[in-house]
Design a protein with these regions (language model features):
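Short, small/polar-rich motifs associated with maturation and membrane association
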Residues: 1-355, 359-367, 460-461, 553, ...
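Surface-exposed loop/interface segments of Gram-negative outer-membrane beta-barrel transport/assembly proteins
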Residues: 120, 234-289, 333-334, 338-340, ...
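Residues on the lipid-exposed face of transmembrane beta-strands in outer-membrane beta-barrel proteins
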Residues: 230, 259, 308-314, 347-351, ...
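Outer-membrane beta-barrel strand-turn architecture
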Residues: 232, 313-314, 353-357, 361, ...
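Transmembrane beta-strand segments that form the barrel wall of outer-membrane beta-barrel proteins
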Residues: 244, 326, 607-619
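Short, contiguous hydrophobic alpha-helices characteristic of membrane insertion segments
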Residues: 595-610
């Protein structure tokens, strides 16, 4: 009634002393609308929302929608493949909106296996994240770039360890043992994940989610493929960029635990209920006690990121040079126990050797390089330990126990020397309290005994040449390598945490690994259009070899319990039994041929045929070759 009265008053230009204009404008009413395209065809499933609110709906089979609105609301209408549209709500009760096609989105070029395609003629399920999306974030790992950005892709963090990788699943779990997708950076399939890659060097990421898009990569693409393209320079003056960011990390949440008084009260009740005498005289005097989570967590752990780059180019070529430094301190144990540093260097360039489109043959030839080097240094603690790790002990150690042996007397010291040989001290000489509670120990003392060091050097590079043989036919050859050297060192001092957790002889464990992959690929791309018929043909070969070696050694009786001196060659091993070594090697070979045919009629009816034949040393002796075909079709 009020809305109707207001409309009549406004139409007649009258006013009424009992009607508040502000109240009228805030009155909620039903608005009906129709969403059409430029041809007058209803747009089904268009999104209509009120700006700044959670109110929204979608258009039905006839392009019609109804929505609760107020005068002055701003409606935002959007649909994939069309330009977004905004409308301000006035006094209208029926609305008609015409959406225009987003020709730029339809003409967008998307990276696919061994080439690019226009988005408008794709028949496969491919999602894309670009550098524009990255500029809004400060991710530390490539997987973090995809979090919440790509439908059908779940990103789960394995642990809170600084630099820890995330588990990526594309459209669910593919196999029981290994569901990780195949990562390909600048055409190079990677071994050991993408830790080495600096997210700020990324130009775009394409996620190949179905068999139609991933079949071109054969046997390794069963769990999907993630294609990463790094940045390159553009024609123009040199552009210098420097970015710096710093943040602070804290545990997302802490478990709610009893304080000392509550713990002693509960324990007394348990003993009484079991028919025994209470074990604590006056729980109220225990006070708050020790919150062990606060003792091991490193509050406001800093994370710092430096990024510098220079890029540019001219008529003959382009270049991109970048340096990155990431330092992430762990939220458990502090910098001495949990830390992650990554140094990255990248150089990409292209050079046009010659270009003459007037030639019938050999119209152009260009070469390029994509080179990336990364060094990672990290420290960490044991992860995902249900019982004996410091995190588990932090929530299960009694709160009425203290961190340190408080004001120890001569008798206390003598008792510790006799019964707890190797009791643990902090850097200032204070003695940690020994808590005998089976494998549940003083978590702060345990942190003092953990010494884990990892380092990793990785170089991924490729050199390529591309020749336009004649119009529409391009030949490309590339030689790539992935070299990695990584190692780990753990050392354990003589220590006594409880009768079940103790180290009677100091020891050090060292592991050294190296791996090298060589990849040689050749492709022919041919494109042809006849009237409204468009063809694209890809033929290619791929030859790959991978070799790795591992050496591991263990030695007892360190000469010095010092992180800088705890090495295998600096021990006092009394017998051959005090030392142990082992090693191993792996090798892998693969040879493949592949092809793809794309056809579309007037960019409305599309067909794609893909076939790859893999020969792999990983296959069974009697089945060393396998075929991976796919067929997909679509229309718009």
């Amino acid at each position: 009634l009020l809305a109707s009265l207001s409309g009549n008053l406004e139409a007649s230009g009258l006013s009424h002393p009992d009607v508040n204009p502000m109240e009228v404008s805030q009155t909620v009413r039903k608005l009906r609308g129709t969403i059409l395209d430029t041809n007058g065809t209803p747009v089904i499933g268009a999104s209509i929302s009120v700006k700044g609110t959670t109110t929204g709906t979608i258009s039905d089979m006839n392009g019609v929608f109804t929505l609760d609105v107020k005068n002055g609301d701003i409606l935002e209408i959007s649909f994939i493949g069309y330009l977004s549209h905004t409308v301000k709500v006035g006094t209208q009760t029926d609305l008609q909106v015409v959406l225009k096609e987003d020709t730029q989105a339809l003409d967008e070029v998307v990276v696919v296996g061994y080439g690019v395609q226009k988005k408008s003629v794709m028949t496969a399920a491919i999602s894309r994240v670009t550098s524009d999306d990255l500029e809004k974030l400060t991710p530390t790992r490539v997987e973090d770039v995809l979090r919440g950005k790509v439908s059908g892709v779940s990103i789960m963090q394995n642990s809170g360890q600084p630099g820890a990788e995330s588990r990526v699943r594309i459209r669910g779990t593919g196999t029981i043992n290994d569901s990780n997708p195949l990562y390909i950076v600048d055409g190079m399939p990677l071994e050991g994940g993408v830790d080495y890659l600096n997210p700020q060097d990324i130009q775009s990421i394409e996620v190949l989610k179905d068999a139609a898009s991933a079949a071109i990569y054969g046997s390794r693409a069963a769990n999907g493929v993630i294609l990463v393209t790094t940045k390159s320079g553009k024609k123009g003056k040199a552009v210098v960029n420097y970015d710096f960011s710093i943040g602070w990390q804290n545990p997302w949440r802490k478990m709610s635990v009893l304080n000392a008084a509550e713990y002693e009260t509960i324990m007394n009740e348990a003993y009484v209920n079991a028919g025994m005498d209470p074990i604590y005289d006056d729980p109220s005097k225990a006070g708050v006690g020790t919150n062990w989570q606060n003792e091991i967590y490193n509050e406001n752990a800093p994370i710092m990121n430096h990024q510098a780059s220079i890029s540019g180019g001219g008529d003959k070529g382009s270049y991109f040079l970048s340096f990155g430094y990431l330092d992430q301190e762990g939220i458990v144990g502090g910098k001495d126990k949990s830390d992650y540093k990554r140094y990255s260097l990248r150089f990409n360039n292209t050079y046009n050797v010659f270009e003459n489109k007037a030639n019938k043959f050999f119209r152009s030839f260009k070469v390029g390089t994509n080179l990336g080097y990364t060094r990672i240094i990290s420290k960490g603690i044991s992860e995902n330990d249900n019982f004996s790790g410091p995190l588990a002990s932090a929530v299960m150690t009694p709160p009425n126990e203290s961190v340190y042996l408080e004001n120890p007397s001569a008798e206390d010291l003598a008792y510790y020397e006799k019964n707890y040989p190797g009791y643990v001290k902090d850097d200032e000489g204070r003695i940690y309290n020994v808590i005998e509670n089976q494998e549940i120990v003083n978590p702060v003392a345990m942190m003092q005994t953990l010494n884990n060091n990892k380092d990793w050097d990785k170089f991924v590079g490729s050199v390529w040449g591309e020749l336009e043989v004649f119009e529409n036919l391009t030949f490309k050859t590339s030689l790539s390598t992935d070299m990695a050297f990584w190692g780990e060192r753990n050392w354990f001092p003589v220590s006594y945490l409880c009768y079940m957790v103790k180290t009677e002889k100091s020891r050090v464990e060292q592991t050294m690994n190296r791996g090298m992959k060589l990849l040689w690929e050749n492709t022919l791309n041919y494109k042809r259009s006849i009237d409204k018929h468009n063809f694209a043909v890809l033929l290619g070969t791929s030859m790959e070899r991978y070799d790795s070696k591992k050496v591991k050694g263990t030695a007892l009786n360190l000469r010095a319990e010092d992180d800088h001196k705890a090495w295998i060659d600096f021990t006092n091993s009394a017998s051959p039994g005090d030392q142990h070594s082992e090693g191993g090697a792996t090798e892998h070979r693969m040879a493949s041929v592949f092809g793809r045919l794309n056809y579309n009629y007037d960019e409305r009816y599309m067909l794609e045929l893909t076939l790859r034949r893999d020969g792999s040393s990983n296959f069974g002796r009697n089945n060393q070759y396998a075929y991976f075909p796919s067929v997909s079709a679509g229309w718009t």
